[in-house]
């Protein structure tokens, strides 16, 4: 069930590890896409805008959860690469305690503050009630988000990227069926979409946990290994919190953008919702390459093979460029068909035109987006998650400037430039940070090797 990524051809290893991740991410996007498509087609444009108005707030909180789980898995991957099984199990146990604690706190706080948050976002009056209901139920499912993402992050850290995919295929199907039943048959509207998402996440998390317990013998723990350890929790938090905060900081820029976009009206919100969902779907492959690099870099750091990390990054560049070109071509010829999944292209002509423009400008910058994802996840896998978090600050600043300066002047075109500007700003920070991180670690490994040689000579 486990897989060692410290030997073999880097391109082949990363590609084979990425493919299940990509399919898994696609199916995870189907949770959101199913809600959006069914709501947009069967309830109406206002309902589509209702779901879309919650997008940045949703990512703000759930991005923190997912980022933190991925961060907790980095030391686990490093320990697996170093073949330190007992300490690995202690880290898994303490990651479990941390997830339980954070899950309870975040659920209580976010559910209690749902309505004030949507008011602060200047959500249009005609959709604020539905938006508050939808995001409130999504926040109620935070424990299930923790459960699935922590279990799947552990599996990936141990080299298994296929198993989480199988569970997501099943639960995505459940999500779509529940969407259709609750929204169409029971007329539950956006509430039905939220409930379907929560139930699907719960199924995915529970099944994944049962599988992890039964199949991964390396994780069979003693009572002593289950004990809370302050030092272990500190190490896990040192990786998890910066990765969670990186997603949150990036999302803060998105929240500010959403605030500015909401002021342009519900039609603009609907256009960006449809275009944004499409972009998220297409960028899944890039995120998957990055996620693969985090595990690959972590295991190879544990094995003291930084030369393989450099080779892995170069291999990832090739994948990013090839995919970005194909995605741009696909969008160029199929954008109307894709938007037609969300909207009636015959009656919502103006909204469709805005969505097409938004997708065009974003797809032009998929290569820098892919590069920043590779650098960010590699830096995280090497244990320098605070550096990666700083790139989120660059993205946030870029989006904030556009929201406060360009959108009031350029209107919708300013919103179209927000993601490309944020991606370029992050690249300007991340590339030098990646070079420094690898060089710094190489020097540390060399110094340690020379010290060992000196000690051996002295003996």
Where are these regions (language model features)?
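Interfacial/gating helices of multi-pass transporter permease domains
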Residues: 39-59, 125-130, 190-191, 232-239, ...
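N-terminal transmembrane alpha-helices
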Residues: 5-43, 56-71, 75, 100-107, ...
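Short alpha-helical transmembrane segments in multi-pass integral membrane proteins
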Residues: 1-18, 76-141, 185-241, 297-364, ...
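Helix-terminus/linker motif at the lipid-water interface of multi-pass membrane proteins
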Residues: 30-49, 118-125, 181-188, 248-281, ...
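Hydrophobic transmembrane alpha-helices of multi-pass small-molecule transporters
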Residues: 60-63, 175-180, 205-209, 281-284, ...
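Short runs within selected transmembrane alpha-helices of multi-pass transporters and secretion channels
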Residues: 69, 138-156, 164-172, 193-206, ...
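Small-residue-rich hydrophobic transmembrane alpha-helices
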Residues: 48-108, 145-164, 271-335, 369-391
């Amino acid at each position: 069930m486990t897989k060692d990524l410290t030997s073999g051809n880097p391109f082949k290893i990363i590609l084979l590890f990425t493919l299940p991740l990509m399919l898994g991410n696609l199916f995870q996007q189907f949770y959101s896409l199913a809600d959006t498509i069914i709501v947009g087609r069967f309830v109406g444009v206002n309902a589509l805008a209702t779901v879309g108005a919650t997008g940045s707030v949703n990512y703000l909180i759930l991005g923190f959860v997912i980022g933190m789980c991925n961060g907790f898995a980095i030391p686990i991957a490093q320990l697996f690469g170093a073949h330190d099984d007992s300490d690995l199990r202690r880290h898994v146990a303490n990651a479990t305690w941390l997830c339980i604690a954070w899950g309870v706190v975040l659920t209580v706080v976010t559910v209690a503050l749902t309505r004030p948050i949507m008011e602060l976002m200047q959500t249009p009056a005609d959709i604020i009630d539905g938006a508050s209901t939808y995001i409130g139920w999504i926040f109620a499912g935070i424990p299930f988000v923790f459960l699935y993402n922590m279990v799947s992050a552990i599996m990936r850290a141990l080299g298994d990227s296929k198993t989480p995919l199988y569970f997501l295929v099943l639960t995505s199907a459940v999500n779509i069926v529940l969407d259709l039943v609750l929204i169409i048959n029971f007329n539950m509207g956006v509430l039905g979409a939220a409930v379907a998402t929560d139930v699907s996440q719960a199924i995915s998390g529970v099944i994944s946990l049962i599988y992890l317990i039964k199949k991964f013998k390396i994780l069979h723990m003693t009572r002593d290994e289950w004990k809370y350890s302050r030092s272990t929790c500190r190490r896990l938090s040192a990786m998890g919190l910066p990765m969670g905060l990186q997603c949150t900081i990036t999302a803060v820029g998105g929240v500010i953008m959403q605030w500015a976009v909401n002021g342009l009206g519900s039609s603009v919100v609907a256009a960006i919702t449809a275009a944004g969902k499409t972009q998220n779907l297409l960028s899944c492959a890039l995120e998957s390459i990055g996620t693969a690099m985090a595990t690959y870099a972590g295991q190879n750091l544990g094995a003291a093979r930084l030369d393989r990390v450099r080779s892995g990054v170069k291999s990832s560049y090739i994948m990013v460029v090839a995919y970005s070109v194909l995605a741009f071509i696909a969008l160029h010829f199929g954008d109307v068909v894709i938007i037609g999944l969300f909207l009636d292209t015959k009656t919502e002509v103006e909204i469709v035109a805005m969505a097409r423009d938004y997708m065009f400008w974003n797809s032009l910058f998929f290569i820098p987006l892919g590069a920043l994802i590779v650098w960010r996840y590699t830096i995280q896998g090497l244990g320098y998650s605070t550096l990666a978090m700083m790139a989120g600050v660059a993205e946030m600043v870029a989006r904030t400037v556009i929201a406060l300066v360009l959108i009031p002047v350029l209107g919708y075109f300013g919103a179209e430039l927000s993601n490309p500007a944020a991606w370029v700003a992050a690249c300007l920070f991340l590339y030098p940070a990646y070079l420094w991180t690898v060089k710094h670690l190489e020097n540390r490994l060399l110094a340690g090797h020379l010290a060992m040689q000196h000690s051996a000579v002295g003996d």
